[in-house]
Amino acid sequence: MKKLILVVSPPACGKTFVSMELSKRLENIVYLDKDTLIPLSKVIFEVAGEEYNRSSDFFEKYIRDKEYEVILDLAYDALKYAELVLINAPFTREIKSKSYIDGLRKKLEEEYNAKLVIIWVETSPETCHQRMIARNSDRDTWKLANWDEYISKVDFNIPEHLLEGKHKDDLLIFHNSSEEEFEQSMKEITPVLHK
């Protein structure tokens, strides 16, 4: 059965690195990264005369949901041609909604004969902070300048409804706070995705 793999977590947990490394080890896979849409989003900020801030009300109201809509549409198209499609994106709000995830599962099964697999990248908040500093990305400027306010709103807990999956590979937890955890998780998760 085809699979749509969502690699999710709060920002700077290592989604991109994990996603890229998994994609290298899997066959017949399409890799999609929501960050690819950032240049288009920057133009929207510019045209609207708004300061570029991915934590702003403007972003939340006009851009955020459209980015997810577009990346999912690309994934649906890719499922017509590939066995595995992997999306690297936080899905911060969506992943907490049981009805959203159930609806996505149903759509994938009915329209694409595909299964949803969620990989939760689990990383300590301290590690995320250090990674955010190291990557030095403009998308993190506000977060780093307002770290205490930002981190107080980030939920690092796996949503309860995801822990109730019917199948072993509905939810895979990728531990990623150290190189040792990364290697162990890679060894455990890659074979499950091949099935």
Segments from the language model and where they lie:
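Glycine-rich phosphate-binding loop used to anchor ATP phosphates in small-molecule kinases
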Residues: 62-112
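ATP-binding Walker
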Residues: 13
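The Walker A (P-loop) glycine that initiates the GxxxxGKT/S ATP-binding motif of P-loop NTPases
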Residues: 9
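Conserved phosphate-donor/acceptor-positioning beta-strand/loop module used by diverse small-molecule
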Residues: 111-132
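Conserved substrate/cofactor phosphate-moiety recognition/catalytic segment
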Residues: 20-70
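Walker A/P-loop
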Residues: 16
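Small-molecule kinase domains that catalyze NTP-dependent phosphoryl transfer to phosphate-bearing small molecules
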Residues: 122, 133-185
